[in-house]
Amino acid sequence: MKVGIDFGTTTSTICRVTADGRIDTQGPIPSLAAYGNGKWYFGEDAEQRLAGEDRAIYPIRDVKLMLGKKSIRIGPNQLDPEEAVSKYLSYLAGRIAKGEVIEEAVIGTPVNVDMAHRQALLSAARKSGFKEVRLVYEPTSALAGAIDLSRLDERALVLVVDWGGGTLDVAVVRKDGDTLREIEVDGDVSDLGGSRMDDELVREVLQRDASLRSKVDAIDGGFDRLKQEIEGSKRNILEEGIDDETAEPWRTPSLWLRETIEVRPADVFDVIRRMADRARERIINFLHRARINPSEITHLLFAGGVCNSPIVQKAIGNEFRSARAVSTDQQPQLLTGYGAARLARSGFTVQLAAPFGVRQCDDSFCEMLPAGHGLAVGAYRVAEFMVTDVLAPEAVFDLGICRQINGESAMMSAPGDAFRSIDQLHIRAQSTPGENKANAGDLIRLFCGIDSTLAVTVYAESNLTADSVRKSLSGVPLAIRVGR
């Protein structure tokens, strides 16, 4: 069986490809775990446990953002986040697999999480019993879930805004035959997600009630547990269609606190507006860095739970008045999982969308990996660079992508408007600065490749100093070729 999964920070979706090619969807499902008395609880069961009186049940929120860390503190317990995610993915699979073996799982991943995060996610998924696990960027997966690729005009330039509980990811995508080609991608991890909105609402509630703050502070896991209840109040205010900011507070009896929690609609709308304004600024800055004028965007797709808000859609959409909204029957928060299932059904390959390499001080560009280079474990390309500056204690390599592909030569001009720097790599080039004379044998070798984590890894070694440096880079634009 094949599945597509959107493992979200606050909600998740799992979609099953049936034997006759249909896609069954379950979601949104709370991305919530709880742990207490040696037992795990997930999803709605975790919500119910946390709403009860037992204070020895501890919430595990936002565990997606903890992947890559060695341990997390949950109440008095130290737990492995990879184990928590593995158990949660098994729980998701159990809701839809009905005892069948999951042969392939396609899982969405935020654009800018690091390699350690993705390695931990892949490991957790395999521990859950998934035989083959593949990753795709969440916004492009959402686009695959929203459209029929055969009907997308190749002249269309689509901006995908995928805003969920933990991340704001954006991608500018163009269709190129049977390929979804990412022109540029970017992502914010944990700063603008819907979970941060809940943090601000919790602070608003606690600032108004000092006695409540004292109670929450005295309980292990109290802040996260209160945050869970306030998130529910926020969701109810939005789903009930309350649009009067002067309306009465939403009141929720809290059994574990023995208090009634009040959340004001005015606070909810104020927080959403502030976050929407920050998101709009980030998107405009992203397009500016990509040298894309907002007027060039022909289509706009909103994905993720936060984008359900009319306030968010209006704040961002006003910058793209000439763009057409991508129409879809799916809810915004279901698109990434549904798109992942579509990709699993049709088959796909992942390639670099643009050449990756090194820009040097004379603006020349040494291409390390060409556009179209596919994912392959252990398949590295090598380039050698002579050490020519005998006074410099270290060599500096500017790593990034070149948006222009001029001919077949590996050496090309990469001026500022064509090259986007992603990171720099520094390596010691001399044992004693200023005393060594450069010669033809003084070399720094760069090994470069991209693997199933979607991260480009660059490994540098100096034959003069025997130093070596390894760096992994996320956020490289990719091309998704649909079909087998």
Feature roles, as predicted:
Residues 1-23, 149-183, 442-462:
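Gly/Thr-rich phosphate-binding beta-strand-loop-beta motif of the actin/hexokinase/Hsp70
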Residues 1-72, 134, 188, 193, ...:
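Early-domain small/polar-rich strand-loop-helix modules and first-structured segments
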Residues 85-99, 139-150, 270-300, 309-315, ...:
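Phosphate/ATP-binding catalytic cores across multiple sugar-kinase/actin-like superfamilies
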Residues 18-128, 199-243, 405-407:
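Phosphate-binding loop and its immediate beta->loop->alpha context
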Residues 348-484:
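Acidic low-complexity intrinsically disordered segments
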Residues 47-60, 64-67, 74, 190-317, ...:
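Gly/charged contiguous loops adjacent to phosphate- or pyrophosphate-bearing nucleotide/cofactor binding elements
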Residues 129-141, 313-339:
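Conserved phosphate-binding/catalytic loops in two-lobed NTP-binding clefts
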Residues 1, 134-161, 289, 334-349:
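Conserved phosphate-binding catalytic cores of ATP/NTP-utilizing and phosphoryl-transfer enzymes
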